[in-house]
Amino acid sequence: MAGIVNLVRSSARSCALSCIVCLAISAPSQQLPTAPQPRQKLPQDGPARPKRVGDQACVPCHEAYSSSYLHTSHHLTSQPASGNAILGSFSGSGSTLKILDPIPSKSSPGLSFHMEVRDGGYYETATVGLPGHEQSHSERIDVVTGSGTRGQSYLYWLGDQLFELPLSYWADGHQWINSPGYKDKTANFSRSIYPRCLECHATDIVPRSSDPLTNHYDRASLVTGISCETCHGGGADHVAAHTATPAIAPSTATILNPARFVRDRQVDLCALCHSGGKRVELAPAFSYLPGQPLDSYLQPAPVDPATLPDVHGNQVGLLQRSRCYLSSPTMSCSTCHDVHAPERAPAAYSDRCLRCHSVQSCKMSQTIGPKIADNCIDCHMPRQPTNAIIVKTAGNAVHTTMRTHWIRIYPEVAQPQ
């Protein structure tokens, strides 16, 4: 039998788990789970929604930035479903995940998932039961979430309701796995997707209710991916001004430029999605405006100096512990990250380190040799296992690794390479 695979994400920000019956197909058409009550009542109305024009309106004047940004993980963090967007296999043995073999002598039903291309779409199908008595349930993939760097999960529409599908794609293993937080040996199609779940994977969507735990939306309002207007604000006035008067000088009067924010507001913009999952919502999802204090939107999480934040989703909290950050009044996320470019190579980040540090100042430079200049981060920002994303295969738990943003000396990894 194929190895049983499970992915678990433990985070207060993760979507609440729905009721799951072991070895039964749970579909929203049968019975929706009861959502937990919100921790506090949010304001009925947030700030006026930005007047958006879409990324294509930025291209005529900002072609270089726009062309590069299309390939970044932020832009690709959600997409409409397509053959190019979905990374997993839909053919041969790679399209099937067998969870349990049926055992007729024990009346133990089997469970398997199959990924299919049919009727012009991409489908997840769960089949459960004993031979000759199987039951199947299929749903079409409508939205892809995740750039694929670590993996992808998939969503589907049922009327105006949005749900997560039970299988996700795990990039490190190049295989289908149970979706984040799903119990193994189940086929659950009824996990609701709430606005806060979407906020870090999409630019906008309009809920049909002020309840923070709704999953009813205006489907046509979904703007996938993190777009230009997520960080620069609505661009309608900016485009209108420059269309009417092409020679007008660039101005912050009609558009937001995070590079001109004070350091704390720059970091707040990133912290919206990179400061952990324990911050309580104070305002409706998608109402945060770049340049405003994040603490007025999300309640600050309690800080325990004795507890190290997990490397998953806590980049800002880890960075703020770093001597580099504490000793500089200007260092921000953009000091090292070019948000408009798809950068992954260690040499690119090491180049940023060398703007303030020298190779000679590193005590390991003589031991490691010249190549140290191209790879500061493996020693000072090593990959560490996360407890938020765990992959279980046939009894073995594999912790996905992510690069820590606590920049410091790690003696255990500072060895000759």
Short names for language-model regions:
Residues 2-16:
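Bacterial N-terminal signal peptides that target proteins for export
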Residues 14-26:
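Bacterial N-terminal signal peptides
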Residues 32-45, 49, 56, 64-145, ...:
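Primarily the internal scaffold of c-type cytochrome electron-transfer domains
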Residues 150:
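N-terminal nucleic-acid engagement/recognition segments and initiation subdomains in replication
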Residues 157-166, 170-199, 203-207:
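Extended acidic/polar, glycine-enriched regions
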